[in-house]
């Protein structure tokens, strides 16, 4: 089994641990190490046992020296070595096959080069990187090769938009598009400005970098953060080149989401039950079918995404990277 280690146990690291435990039967990798430069092991245990959003109620978690001991309902025990060290002093650097950089502090190749020693062959960054290759699961993950040592999974908004936009462009052609997000944010990140706040969104830059058919002249992102801890909301607009009926669009999307190239990435719901029912969804976005509209060649899609739980696509990418052909490629033959 491929070994991984997490650096950074904030919201993303917490969600990743829970998602991995809940989907361990599908995982090609083990989480063997966790480091955080701020939190002690006792503080981490307290967070795991008391967080009101990410609930580990199917697991009994305790401490044994410098290890988190996790026992599931099946009685199986998992031990994870925990360290509370600055980045340059992490004692297990070079031991895992894959380094999961989840601190949000190290988002460039230069920041992550230190991890590529010993057994470590790949580094996966849990945030947008502007110089590492962005690998979006369900869009370009099959382009990953042995030379891609340090990669980013994108972001929650990038994963929600890019595979869908790519599909729509291939099928109908996209003339222009905009993406609108109401995105949750912890209160402390807004400091004294504790209300709605418009911000820059990574999709504004990453979208055109990944998709050749959008640019600053035909693509706009409106990104508003709001201080609460629930599921976030999105609205997409696509002006299509091809003249297509509403029903044809609905049928094509339904097929793509259920059994086509977007299966497992997106879902179509028959009614709008509000955002909170989509807490911990495995989908990058869930769209509401009755709220889907077409007006003058524009397709409007409304839905929800659990941005904190975009670890679902990070998990998928780590799982893909953990396959033998990626982590241990066959040596090239020479004549």
Model-derived features with residue positions:
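Short intrinsically disordered coil segments
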Residues: 97, 251-254, 320
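Electropositive phosphate-/nucleotide-binding environments in soluble metabolic enzymes
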Residues: 6, 10, 14, 105-106, ...
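N-terminal Rossmann-like NAD(P) cofactor-binding subdomain of oxidoreductases
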Residues: 1-189, 305, 323-334
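NAD(P)-dependent Rossmann-like dehydrogenase/reductase catalytic/cofactor-binding core
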Residues: 282-335
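C-terminal substrate-binding/catalytic lobe of Rossmann-fold NAD(P)-dependent oxidoreductases
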Residues: 18, 23-91, 173-176, 181-302
């Amino acid at each position: 089994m491929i070994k991984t280690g997490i650096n950074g146990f904030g919201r993303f690291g917490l969600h990743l641990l829970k998602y991995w435990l809940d989907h361990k039967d599908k995982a090609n990798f083990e989480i063997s190490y966790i480091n955080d430069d701020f939190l002690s092991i006792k503080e981490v245990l307290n967070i795991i046992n008391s967080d009101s959003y990410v609930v580990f109620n199917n697991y009994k978690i305790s401490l044994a020296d410098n290890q988190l001991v996790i026992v599931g309902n099946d009685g199986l025990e998992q031990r994870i070595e925990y360290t509370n060290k600055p980045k340059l002093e992490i004692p297990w650097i070079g031991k895992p096959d894959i380094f999961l950089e989840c601190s949000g502090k190290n988002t460039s190749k230069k920041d992550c080069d230190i991890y590529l020693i010993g057994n470590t062959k790949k580094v996966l960054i849990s945030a947008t990187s502007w110089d590492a290759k962005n690998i979006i699961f369900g869009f370009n993950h099959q382009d990953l090769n042995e030379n891609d040592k340090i990669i980013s999974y994108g972001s929650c908004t990038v994963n929600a938009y890019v595979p869908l936009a790519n599909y729509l462009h291939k099928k109908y052609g996209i003339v222009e598009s905009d993406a609108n997000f109401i995105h949750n944010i912890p209160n402390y990140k807004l400091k004294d400005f504790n209300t709605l706040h418009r911000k820059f969104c990574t999709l504004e830059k990453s979208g055109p970098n990944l998709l050749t058919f959008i640019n600053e002249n035909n693509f706009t992102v409106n990104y508003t953060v709001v201080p609460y801890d629930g599921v976030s909301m999105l609205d997409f607009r696509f002006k299509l080149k091809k003249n297509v009926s509403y029903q044809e669009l609905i049928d094509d999307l339904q097929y793509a989401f259920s059994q086509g190239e977007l299966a497992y990435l997106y879902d179509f719901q028959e009614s709008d039950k509000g955002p909170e029912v989509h807490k911990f969804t495995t989908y990058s976005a869930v769209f509401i079918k009755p709220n889907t509209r077409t007006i003058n060649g524009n397709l409007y899609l409304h839905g929800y995404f659990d941005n904190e739980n975009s670890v679902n696509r990070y998990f998928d990418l780590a799982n893909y990277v953990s396959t033998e052909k990626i982590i241990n490629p066959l040596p090239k033959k020479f004549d």
